[in-house]
């Protein structure tokens, strides 16, 4: 619906008046053939009843409507209009194209968001502030939080119970396997085969990597860095049976003879390009697994594998 003509200063050109609502055009559109202009809301409602121009009855549909020419939009934008909140005491008169920005900041706008300054900090429409009760609001907030906390505590208790049952089942299973293994030695071989297949599946899921700056190797990572790498290994699906061993092998104290000291690493540097390395996801680090590096000498690999951490220079192939 259009703007009330009485809100404007001076006379308004009749070409800027909507023939349907008799107000000044709001979001104007135009019928392309007869060039009659209407408020978008007015003509849309009109077309719900009939598909003709309200002025000359020529056939028109919503699909035919087009924006009004720029000159008409410019004429509308320059009109001076009184604020919507004049009835609430606002005396501002602004250009029509500035009306919306004025309304958002108008001190007299009853729906302008304001913040309670009595302590609760709730944001609400200005006209609701006189009837606002901080205690009532805060009581509602506390009740919602208490309800949420109760739900979380219930869920946490259920998870703890499930975890305890799973741990008990695992202990029983381990005891059962030990008992069976004492009777059937072949079970040990089966367990090792299953574990080896899990390791291979994990290794094959990692992206091949290339190290471009071997000189950036961190041979003595501290506990914090090791914990970060360990978390990434776990998140990548690394079998739990080898996680701790791999982290232990991230420090030069556990490296094989060919990597044990800076001098030997420099001497054997020409062999590094022969490593098959896999990227630890999201980190400047690689794993060099023994199962993929059997072509390397025993002095260059370690079971089940090595973790090499770098300051930079790790790229996925």
Swiss-Prot record:
Zinc finger (RING-type): 18-57
Reactions performed catalytically: S-ubiquitinyl-[E2 ubiquitin-conjugating enzyme]-L-cysteine + [acceptor protein]-L-lysine = [E2 ubiquitin-conjugating enzyme]-L-cysteine + N(6)-ubiquitinyl-[acceptor protein]-L-lysine
Function comment: Acts as E3 ubiquitin-protein ligase and regulates the degradation of target proteins. Polyubiquitinates MYD88. Negatively regulates MYD88-dependent production of pro-inflammatory cytokines. Can promote TRIF-dependent production of type I interferon and inhibits infection with vesicular stomatitis virus. Also promotes activation of TBK1 and IRF3. Involved in the ubiquitination of erythropoietin (EPO) and interleukin-3 (IL-3) receptors.
Chain intervals annotated as zinc finger (SIAH-type): 78-138
Gene Ontology biological process terms in this record: autophagy; extrinsic apoptotic signaling pathway; negative regulation of cell migration; negative regulation of cell population proliferation; negative regulation of mitophagy; positive regulation of protein catabolic process; positive regulation of reactive oxygen species metabolic process; proteasomal protein catabolic process
Coiled-coil regions listed: none
InterPro entries given in the database record: NRDP1 (IPR015036), NRDP1_C (IPR037255), Znf_RING (IPR001841), Znf_RING/FYVE/PHD (IPR013083), Znf_RING_CS (IPR017907), Znf_SIAH (IPR013010)
Pathway entry: Protein modification; protein ubiquitination
Keyword Nucleotidyltransferase belongs to the record: no
Molecular function as annotated in GO: erythropoietin receptor binding; identical protein binding; interleukin-3 receptor binding; protein domain specific binding; receptor tyrosine kinase binding; small GTPase binding; ubiquitin protein ligase activity; ubiquitin-protein transferase activity
Key words of the record: Apoptosis, Autophagy, Metal-binding, Transferase, Ubl conjugation, Ubl conjugation pathway, Zinc, Zinc-finger
CDD domains named among the record's database cross-references: mRING-HC-C3HC3D_Nrdp1
Subunit structure: Interacts with USP8, ERBB3, PRKN and BIRC6. Interacts with CSF2RB, EPOR, IL3RA, MYD88 and TBK1. Interacts with Clec16a.
Phylogenetic placement of the source organism: Eukaryota, Metazoa, Chordata, Craniata, Vertebrata
Description of post-translational modifications: Autoubiquitinated. Autoubiquitination leads to proteasomal degradation. Deubiquitinated by USP8 to get stabilized which induces apoptosis.
Enzyme Commission number(s) from the entry: 2.3.2.27
GO cellular component terms, A-Z: endoplasmic reticulum tubular network; perinuclear region of cytoplasm
Record's protein name: E3 ubiquitin-protein ligase NRDP1
One Pfam family in the UniProt entry: USP8_interact
PANTHER family: RECEPTOR-ASSOCIATED FACTOR, PUTATIVE-RELATED, TNF RECEPTOR ASSOCIATED FACTOR
């Amino acid at each position: 619906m259009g703007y009330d003509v009485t809100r404007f200063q001076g006379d308004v050109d009749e070409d800027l008046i909507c023939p349907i609502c008799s107000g000044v055009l709001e979001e104007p559109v135009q019928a392309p053939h007869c060039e009659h202009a209407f408020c978008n809301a007015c003509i849309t409602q009109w077309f719900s009843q009939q598909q003709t121009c309200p002025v000359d009855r020529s056939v028109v549909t919503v699909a035919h409507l087009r924006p009004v020419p720029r000159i008409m939009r410019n004429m509308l934008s320059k009109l001076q209009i009184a604020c919507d909140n004049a009835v609430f005491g606002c005396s501002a008169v602004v250009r029509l194209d500035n009306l919306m920005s004025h309304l958002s900041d108008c001190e007299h706008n009853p729906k302008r968001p304001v913040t309670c300054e009595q302590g609760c900090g709730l944001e609400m429409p200005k006209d609701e502030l006189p009837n606002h009760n901080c205690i009532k609001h805060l009581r509602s907030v506390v009740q919602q939080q208490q309800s949420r906390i109760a739900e979380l505590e219930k869920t946490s208790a259920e998870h703890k119970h499930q975890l305890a049952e799973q741990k008990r089942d695992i202990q029983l299973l381990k005891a059962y396997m030990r008992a069976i293994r004492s009777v059937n030695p072949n079970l040990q071989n089966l367990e090792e085969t299953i574990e080896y297949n899990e390791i291979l599946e994990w290794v094959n899921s990692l992206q091949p990597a290339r190290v471009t700056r071997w000189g950036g190797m961190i041979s003595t990572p501290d506990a914090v860095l090791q914990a970060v790498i360990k978390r990434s290994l776990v998140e990548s699906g690394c079998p739990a049976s080898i996680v701790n061993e791999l982290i232990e092998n991230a420090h030069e104290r556990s490296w094989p003879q060919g990597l044990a000291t800076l001098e030997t690493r420099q001497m054997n540097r020409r062999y590094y390009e022969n490593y098959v390395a896999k990227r630890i996801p999201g980190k400047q680090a690689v794993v060099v697994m023994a199962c993929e590096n059997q072509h390397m000498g025993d002095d260059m690999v370690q079971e089940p594998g090595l973790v090499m951490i770098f300051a930079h220079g790790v790229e996925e192939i």
